[in-house]
Every structure is written in C-alpha cells, then in structure tokens.
Amino acid sequence: MSFQDLEAGTRSPAPNRFTGGRQQRPSSRGDPSQEVAAGIFRISTAVNSFFRLVNSIGTPKDTLELRDKLQKTRLQISELVKNTSAKLKEASEADLHGSASQIKKIADAKLAKDFQSVLKEFQKAQRLAAEREITYTPVVTKEIPTSYNAPELDTESLRISQQQALLLQSRRQEVVFLDNEITFNEAIIEEREQGIREIEDQIRDVNGMFKDLALMVNHQGNIVDDISSNLDNSHAATTQATVQLRKAAKTQRSNSSLTCLLILIFGIVLLIVIIVVLV
Amino acid sequence: MAIIFALVARGTVVLSEFSATSTNASSISKQILEKLPGNDSDSHMSYSQDRYIFHVKRTDGLTVLCMADETAGRNIPFAFLDDIHQRFVKTYGRAIHSAQAYSMNDEFSRVLSQQMEFYSNDPNADRMSRIKGEMSQVRNVMIENIDKVLDRGERLELLVDKTENMQGNTFRFRKQARRYRTIMWWRNVKLTIALILVLALVVYIAMAFVCHGPSLPSCFK
C-alpha cells in the first residue's frame, strides 16, 4: 500500500513539471528515490522471511540447516540495509543541494520514515532470534554421521557400545549398593520404631497410673471433707455443752448460798430453844 | 557386655583390634574382611554367626568392625563404629594409608576397650535407652506415689472413724450437760422453797410466844 502511494506520488508530478528537459532530468533525479523504494521493499520481504525462520526456532523444524539459513538471511538483510542507506543518503544530499520541489522532499522524507520502520522491525527480529538461539539448541539429525568414513563409524560405534556397557555395569553396582544401604537403614528404622513403641507403652502405663492417682486423691478428698464436717459438729456440740456446764456451775453456786442460809437459821432457832429451856 | 570384639582395618590389613573375651572373633573377622563386597565403597554390613552379629562399617577406605550380642540391636553397635572411626581418623590422620599391620594396636586397643565399655554399659550411649531409663524411673516414682496415697487413704479412713466417734461423744456430752443443768436448777428451786418454809415456821413460833397461844388469840382480838 505504502509503495503504491509512493509510486503514484513519484510518477504523477513528473510529466507536469519537467516538460522541457524530460529525458535527462527525470532519469538523473528519479533513480535514487526509486532505488531506495525498491531496496525498502526487498528489505521488508527479507525481514518477513527472517521472521518466519525465527518462529521455527524451538520447534522440531529447528535444525542446523535452519540456523545456517538464518545466518545467511541476516547477512543478506544487513547488506541490503547498507546499500539502501547509501542510496537514501545520496537522495537526501541531492534534495539539499539541488532545487528540488516540495512534493519530492515530502516523498523522500516518507521514504526515510519507511526505511526507519523497516530497520526497527529487523532489529526486533534480530533480538528475538538471539533470545531463541540461546534458549534452544538445534535438533541434531542422524544424517550427519553419513559424512564419516566407514572405519571411523565402526570405531565410534564400538566406543559407544563399550561406554554403554561400562555405564550399565556401574549402574548395576550402584543399584546393589543402594539395596544394601536401604536394607541397613530399614533395619535401623525398625529398631528405632521398636524402641519408640516401648517408650509409648511406658508412657501409657504412666498415664494410667496418673489417672488412678487422680481417682484415689479425689476419693480421699471426700473422706477429708467428712472428717472436716465431723470436727465442725464436734466443736459446735462441745461449745454448747460448755455453755450448759457454765449455767449449771452458776446454779450450783446459788444452791450453796441457800444451803448456808438454811443452816444459819436452824442454828439460831436451836440457840433460842436452848436459852428458853435453861431459863 | 554387649560389644565383645572390635577391629580397625585398611582393606584387609588389620591396624588395631581388641577382644574382651577369648574367642575366635579375630579369624572370623579376617574372613569377613576378605569377603566384603564392593571395592572400597562406603557401606554398612551385618553378618550373623551363632549368637553374635558382626557389624561392619567402611568409610573412606577405612573399615571398622565389631562383634556384638543379638540383644544389642544395631543402633548402639553402629554408633560405636562411627565413634571409633572418628577417633581413629582424628588420632592418626594420613598415617592410616601407609601404616603396617597392627602398628596402632598398642595405643588404640585401650581406646577400643574404653569405648566398648561405654557403649555396652552406659545408658547415655543411646538417646532411646536414656529415655527408656527415665521413663522407668518415672514409673517407679508413680508406683511409690500410688502406694503412699493408698496408705494415706487407710489413715484417712481411720481418722474419719475416730472423728465420727468424737462427734457422737460430743453430742452425748452436750445432752448430759443439759440434763445436769436441769438437775441443778430443780435443786435450787427446792432449796428456795425450803428456805421460805423454814422462815415462815420461825416467824409463826415467835408470834405464838408473843400472843400467848398457838392460835394467836390475843393478836387478832
């Protein structure tokens, strides 16, 4: 679309302005701009192709051939960018020095802007390619050993088989060793479990003892309460008895006084009787 | 004693050994050293023979072996082997790799003897055994506590009986005290009445004399 507008813009003013020297002036002034436009178009196409290759990185299509193609495409785009940049500079110099028309200046500015946008896309594609190349490794196909010689192939296969045999043997030894270690650790764990179980039994016994002790202490608490109530009742009864005895003592003291008084009266009466009888 | 024989070797070369009793453990252990599987790889093994078990531990090319009772289990013998290995490496260091047979026996057999004694008899050698011992002590203390509480219960039974008797006695004492007070009161009443009668009689007799007759004729005329 933008290229169509560019071509329309470049072609439409040509026959109107340069009616006098048509053949000489359009060819000398139109070549850099047209070449820049063509270069930008090719760069854009190459960048799209580069993007397709970059999207294949990390998939089963990712092979060494793909990586080589990526590298070639990158170099091709760099070369195109270099050429187009030189032509763009040439066109801008012609615009500055020569008495170019306003429409042409605007067209060249637009070309420069398009060139910058294409460059940005290329840089983005390059950055993405770099990230993916670091993250993933290409799939090594089996076609590569076909380039070897027959004796080298035999030597390689023999070496590989020997390595596999040694690896298998060492793994078997490791398995035996691990089995021994597992047996040993299981025996240790079994013994530890038994010890812990015995401790658990002892703790359970102690728990039962504590419960029995609690029951007995609770029962004896009731007995102590009975003892306390008995003592309180005894104390109260003794206090009341003491009060009664105190009253009895007071009454007895009064009785003694009365008894003395009676004896005194009898004495006086007896004395009077004796006096009367003697007289 | 749980651990009876101990030995330290490099490969099949015996560097030091000690035996608590006279047995054929030395020859049997040599056979075991020759038959150990694996080439200088770290491992733990246990071989049984009659009533004894040979425990073998190999670490960094140094082999430690001990013969123990079946009742000793595995925790204590292997803890013993770990301890002996550390002490041996700490004491002799790099000399282990180039030592002659039995060259450390004079010095290290005493250490073997001490550690055999420690791991066989001291309950602190194993945390599990120590906890079992402590739980046994706790259980014994609880049994004593229960006995004391039972004894206290019996005494409390006697005490409650005695206090009930005392309560009955004090109730009876109170009743008798009240009765005694009543008796004293009545006696006081009787004496008062008697006194009044005697006084009345005396006054009557005196008036009889003064009025010249028992019927008091002159006083009421």
Swiss-Prot record, chain A:
- Name the residues that span the membrane: 259-279
Q: What does this protein do?
A: May function in the docking or fusion of transport vesicles with the prevacuolar membrane.
Database matches in InterPro entries: SNARE, Syntaxin, Syntaxin/epimorphin_CS, Syntaxin_N, T_SNARE_dom
Instruction: State the name under which the record lists this protein.
Output: Syntaxin-21
The answer on whether this UniProt entry bears the keyword Coiled coil reads yes
Disulphide bonds annotated for this chain are none
User: Would you say which domain of life the source belongs to?
Assistant: Eukaryota
Q: Which GO biological-process labels does this protein carry? A: Golgi to vacuole transport; late endosome to vacuole transport; protein targeting to vacuole
Q: What is its main location?
A: membrane
- Cytoplasmic compartment ranges equal 2-258
Where does the record place the region Disordered? 1-34
Q: Which PANTHER family match?
A: LD27581P (PTHR19957:SF38), SYNTAXIN (PTHR19957)
- Quaternary state and partners of this protein? Interacts with VTI11 and SYP51 to form a t-SNARE complex and with alpha-SNAP to form a 20S complex.
Keywords from UniProt, A to Z, are: Acetylation, Coiled coil, Membrane, Protein transport, Transmembrane, Transmembrane helix, Transport
Q: How does it sit in the membrane?
A: Single-pass type IV membrane protein
Annotated source species:
Arabidopsis thaliana (Mouse-ear cress)
Q: What sequence ranges are listed for the domain t-SNARE coiled-coil homology?
A: 186-248
Which cell locations does it reside in? Answer: Prevacuolar compartment membrane
- Pfam assignment, any one: Syntaxin_2
Name the family the entry cites. Belongs to the syntaxin family.
Polar residues composition bias: which ranges? 21-31
**According to its UniProt record, in which tissues is this protein expressed?**
A high level expression is seen in the roots while a low level expression is seen in the leaves.
Give coiled-coil spans as residue ranges. 65-94
Q: Which GO terms describe its cellular component?
A: late endosome; membrane; trans-Golgi network transport vesicle
Swiss-Prot record, chain B:
According to the record's subunit comment, the protein's assembly and interactions are:
Interacts with subunits of the vacuole protein sorting (HOPS) complex including VPS11, VCL1, VPS18, VPS33, VPS39 and VPS41.
Q: Specify the protein name.
A: Vesicle-associated membrane protein 713
What membrane topology is annotated for this entry? Single-pass type IV membrane protein
What residue ranges lie in the Cytoplasmic compartment?
Answer: 2-190
Name the source organism.
Arabidopsis thaliana (Mouse-ear cress)
Tell me the name of the encoding gene. Answer: VAMP713
What's the entry's take on its domains?
The longin domain is critical for the vacuolar localization.
Q: Keyword Acetylation on this protein?
A: yes
| Residues that bear N-acetylalanine | 2
Kindly list the residue ranges recorded as spanning the membrane: 191-211
Q: Vesicular compartment: which residues?
A: 212-221
Q: Which residues form the Longin domain?
A: 7-112
Tell me, in a sentence or two, what this protein's role is: Involved in the targeting and/or fusion of transport vesicles to their target membrane.
Q: Which cysteines are joined by disulfide bonds?
A: none
GO CC annotation terms, alphabetical: Golgi apparatus; HOPS complex; plasma membrane; vacuolar membrane; vacuole
Matching entries from Gene3D superfamilies are given as: 1.20.5.110, Longin domain
SUPFAM superfamilies per UniProt:
SNARE fusion complex, SNARE-like
Regarding tissue, the record states:
Highly expressed in stems and roots. Detected in flowers and leaves.
What keywords appear on the UniProt entry? Acetylation, Membrane, Protein transport, Transmembrane, Transmembrane helix, Transport, Vacuole
